């Protein structure tokens, strides 16, 4: 189905819908993974020094308790309790950081210093997500897309991540986009929600209006059942 959508400066977006609704396909379109058969995809990444989607849009897909489907999941699976000595330290994986001001800001926000000399396989689920966010944000993207950031977390770690993301949303140069399956996962810092269902991308709505509309709809469905 055709999609007309804009993400404006100052907005933090949640793309919400059930599994299989088409959320991942929408993200693929937004990031330019697939060429459009029709229409135009336009970016404005100012004040970034580069205008490429590769440099300015970073995507993290969380799959399970151990973080994600990409590099960090690989780290956790590659080393186990029998070969901990070969596992890298957080410090080594973060590498050299050229932007000292950004490093200090992110290390303070995510409390990275106490983790630097820990081995990657010994991080808790919450620590691993903070590590991955820090590593990604050290590249200074304009847009950070997180797919299922709360999956596999206990209540305390979920609350911690909520608080960290809320602080992250206050960074003037960063727009956050969350891809979520559950209505109740939409954090308070989210300004707008894009509902996706059965391959159809709905109209972007303000968060309060979305929650009101979809809770009423779900209540009607329950009564009908």
Predicted segments, located by residue:
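Catalytic Walker B motif of ABC-type/P-loop ATPase nucleotide-binding domains
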Residues: 144-148
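ABC ATPase nucleotide-binding domain signature region
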Residues: 27-99
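Conserved H-loop
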Residues: 182-188
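Hydrophobic anchor residue at the start of the ABC signature
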Residues: 133, 161
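Conserved ABC ATPase signature
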Residues: 119-123
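Conserved ABC ATPase "signature" region
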Residues: 98-115
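Conserved beta-strand-loop-alpha-helix hinge in the C-terminal portion
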Residues: 196-223
